[in-house]
Amino acid sequence: MSYTEKPDEITKDEWMEKLNNLHVQRADMNRLIMNYLVTEGFKEAAEKFRMESGIEPSVDLETLDERIKIREMILKGQIQEAIALINSLHPELLDTNRYLYFHLQQQHLIELIRQRETEAALEFAQTQLAEQGEESRECLTEMERTLALLAFDNPEDSPFGDLLNMMQRQKVWSEVNQAVLDYENRESTPKLAKLLKLLLWAQNELDQKKVKYPKMTDLSKGVIEEPK
């Protein structure tokens, strides 16, 4: 007689019980947090966390100062100043990472458009970005999308308004931060981010195999849903 054996399933309650019984050393968690703060350049938070947890950072926190200045400039929209500081720290970085340089130049163009400096934006695009657009289809597409903002009286409300959001500046800063850390042969991705990517990969593998399991659906809040 043949029969189909029902696969093992685990409920959310069972899963949560297993998680609650799993012992993770507080020091290990603290090291993950410190690693994140240092990698992302949060010096003040890292200093305070060192005092509270007793965990020493893997690098001298004073070495974060220049990255912090670059971050502040980019998040304020001071792109040309950020480029100048990057060049003073690592003169070859933007020469060897042309996409990063393009994205910084693109962000400067976005800032000109934000300030409604239309003529300056068009001149900058023609003199500084056109050549890269000719060399790369990807750059051309991004440049066209950016210039499309000029077609709207209120570009913030246009289909391309996301370029004017703070998240766009944050995106550029994250790219710069990773490039600088890579250039300095430092860890450029926080260990916590790697663990979250591993979690997403594992869940995707289970989904592909049609496995029913308690799934984390919101990483920011740690929301776990019942198996479906």
Swiss-Prot record:
InterPro entries the record matches: CRA_dom (IPR013144), CTLH/CRA (IPR024964), CTLH_C (IPR006595), LisH (IPR006594), Ubq-SigPath_Reg (IPR050618)
Entry comment on modification after translation: Polyubiquitinated through 'Lys-48'-polyubiquitin chains, leading to proteasomal degradation in the absence of Wnt stimulation.
Alphabetical list of Pfam families matching this protein: CTLH, LisH
Domain CTLH: 63-120
Region Interaction with CTNNB1: start-end pairs: 116-212
Record keywords: Cytoplasm, Nucleus, Ubl conjugation, Wnt signaling pathway
Transmembrane segments annotated in the record for this chain: none
Superkingdom to which the source organism belongs: Eukaryota
GO biological process assignments: positive regulation of canonical Wnt signaling pathway; positive regulation of cell population proliferation; proteasome-mediated ubiquitin-dependent protein catabolic process; Wnt signaling pathway
Compartments where found: Cytoplasm; Nucleus
Molecular function GO labels: protein homodimerization activity
Residues in coiled coil: none
SMART domains per UniProt: CRA, CTLH, LisH
Role, per record: Core component of the CTLH E3 ubiquitin-protein ligase complex that selectively accepts ubiquitin from UBE2H and mediates ubiquitination and subsequent proteasomal degradation of the transcription factor HBP1. Acts as a positive regulator of Wnt signaling pathway by promoting beta-catenin (CTNNB1) nuclear accumulation.
Annotated family: Belongs to the GID8 family.
Name of the protein in its database record: Glucose-induced degradation protein 8 homolog
Gene: GID8
